[in-house]
A protein has these predicted regions:
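Hydrophobic packing and interface segments
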Residues: 1, 6-590
Length: 590
């Protein structure tokens, strides 16, 4: 059965890319819509009790989490079923079909990644431009409270919270979620390429999808477990969120063992423990981020103490603290990579295919509870905007006190969510790097090359060549100057990208500062409350600034791998990906 006919997979690639980007954008849109409605309801609920405010804000954030995982798994399932029907089975090599399906589906992940890139960069520029403009002129120069309706940039600031921390974070984790499942499925198919055991190959492909599906249900259970008492402190509030997250994590561990046992997957016990490793790494990164960013712990308290001697010492201490804070997450990810590889390979480091599958399944484990993990992050801007609504609508001091407590919690959960997103992206990136080799296999097959002539004189069939064979064929070693050049370029790219986006924020924020000053100067009666500021103008400045400034950094991230591949070939691209992944990971945590 060849439903695709002579047109091949070309149209499928285009449609997968578009659907990946579309569903990523749709999840961000729905999350923003929910967050916009929820902030007013959270402020209203905070009039009754802190617990009601927390539950409304958190469950509204859960909408974002569940939309992301639901749409992601829906689209993955749709394309798998469609491609399984459309692609014919090769009678001579039946295991090749699953490799073609899983590598083809990576195009869907590329669409999601592209959308995440634009959402993250554009959303970040929008958010920070509005934030800097509102705080620098309103709070510092004019001396009015935060979220005061007299500040022209207040609405832009509140909108920016949703754009950057809801839509941007949602698109980011949507990409990591889908990427981890797709890369692990591709590595599972590759682990059994050329073997007669196509049933075991199918089990390896379907396992990450089943774990993710069960994770959605267990995330919902954890969401309903979140509650707190009145007058709770920061540690109690953090504990209430941790209760839901930990409950989901424990349940997914049990469920993973049952799923892989029922599947009868080869080495299922060790692979189940690899999932546990992924979950533990995620928890460690979250707790580490919480420790370094929460006001309840020593690092932030010492940073606040340094403010007694002036802003210079705060900046110096903050940079130093940020650098130190990278230690635990990096050690956690490194340990997770080694342990998951070692477990899935059956304690045999030479079994590269299954070892890489273990790293991928660890990333799936880390993201299996994304439904509730993303809820804790999307909760942040909802609580923040609820405080703004309480301030602008003149609700009582008790309400503002409750929303401030929720907002303070939201700042910590936002930092935790970012750390979690970065850690999961590191494992997913490594799995995608390995699956890049599978794309090379498919590419060589389509070009008509059937044999690999290795440097040691051995010839290997392209379909049955191992990961090591491809590394030998392309001379991917540290002694190859192409690999080293790619690694240096990748390391540099992370810093160049950050520098460009920071400069973009600076330029957009400067326009915002000028506009707020202009309105204070030209519209008489704003500071006395007799005249209304032009909020729309500030929103327009942030929007145009974000759209204009995000183009060059985003295009740079897309074009760099293509240019490197054309100049240095496959070794250069692999070096670029390794360098970008390692330096980008540390820089992102910092």
């Amino acid at each position: 059965r060849d439903v695709l006919g002579s047109r091949g997979l070309g149209d499928v690639y285009k449609r997968q890319f578009l659907t990946g980007g579309f569903f990523s954008g749709l999840s961000g849109f729905l999350g923003m819509k929910t967050a916009t409605y929820a902030s007013a309801r959270t402020a209203n609920a905070a009039q009754h009790s802190l617990n009601k405010g927390l539950r409304v804000a958190f469950r509204s954030g859960a909408v974002m989490g569940l939309v992301v995982v639901g749409l992601g798994l829906l689209d993955i399932s749709f394309w798998y079923i469609l491609l399984d029907y459309c692609i014919p089975t090769d009678a001579l090599n039946p295991s090749a079909k699953l490799c073609v399906i899983t590598t083809t589906m990576l195009t869907f992940g590329m669409g999601a990644s592209t959308q995440a890139l634009f959402a993250r960069v554009g959303g970040g520029i929008y958010t920070k431009a509005a934030d800097v403009g509102a705080d620098l002129v309103g709070k510092v120069e004019a001396g009015i409270p935060e979220d005061d309706p007299r500040n022209p940039a207040t609405i832009a600031d509140n909108v920016g919270d949703n754009v950057g921390d809801v839509a941007g974070m949602g698109a980011d984790l949507y990409e990591s979620y889908c990427g981890s499942i797709l890369a692990t499925a591709a590595l599972g198919a590759a682990a059994f390429i050329g073997s007669d055991d196509t049933v075991m190959q199918f089990k390896a492909v379907i396992a990450p999808m089943l774990i993710a599906a069960v994770g959605i249900v267990l995330s919902i259970i954890g969401i309903f477990a979140v509650r707190t008492k009145e007058n709770a402190g920061m540690k109690e509030l953090l504990g209430s969120l941790a209760t839901g997250t930990n409950l989901s994590s424990v349940l997914i561990v049990v469920a993973t063992f049952l799923i892989l046992w029922a599947l009868g997957l080869e080495n299922w016990v060790n692979i189940s423990f690899a999932v546990v490793v992924g979950l533990i790494v995620g928890i460690v990164i979250g707790r580490s981020t919480e420790y370094y960013t929460s006001q309840s712990y020593k690092p932030t308290q010492r940073l606040a103490e340094s403010g007694k001697t002036g802003p210079a010492t705060v900046i110096i201490s903050g940079i130093g603290l940020g650098m130190v804070s990278t230690t635990i997450p990096v050690l956690a990810v490194v340990t997770g990579i080694i342990l998951s590889y070692w477990l899935a390979s059956g304690f045999d480091f030479a079994n590269i295919s299954m070892g890489l599958y273990g790293i991928g399944i660890a990333a799936v484990g880390m993201l299996s509870t994304l439904g509730i993990t993303l809820a804790t992050d999307a909760y942040g801007p909802i609580a923040d905007n609820a405080g703004g609504n309480a301030e602008m609508s003149g609700l009582g001091k008790e309400v503002r006190k409750r929303t401030d407590a929720l907002d303070s919690l939201g700042n910590t959960t936002a930092a935790t969510g970012k750390g979690f997103a970065i850690g999961s992206a590191a494992l997913t990136g490594l799995a995608l790097l390995a699956s890049y080799v599978e794309e090379i296999r498919i590419g060589l097959t389509r070009l008509g090359q059937t044999i690999l002539e290795l440097p040691n004189g051995i010839t290997v069939d392209v379909h049955n060549a191992s990961f090591t064979d491809y590394m030998l064929y392309y001379d991917v070693t540290l002694m190859n100057p192409k690999v080293l050049s790619g690694m240096f370029l990748g390391s540099m790219m992370a810093f160049l990208f950050c520098g460009l986006t920071m400069n973009a924020v600076g330029r957009a924020a400067a326009h915002m500062v000028e506009e707020v000053r202009r309105q204070f100067r030209e519209i008489k009666g704003i500071l006395t409350g007799e005249a209304e500021p032009d909020y729309a103008r500030c929103v327009q400045i942030s929007t145009k600034g974000a759209q204009r400034e995000m183009v060059f950094p985003s295009l740079l991230a897309i074009i760099a791998p293509i240019a490197t591949g054309l100049i240095f070939g496959v070794p250069g691209v692999i070096g670029l990906l390794i360098g970008g992944l390692s330096s980008g990971f540390v820089l992102a945590i910092f």
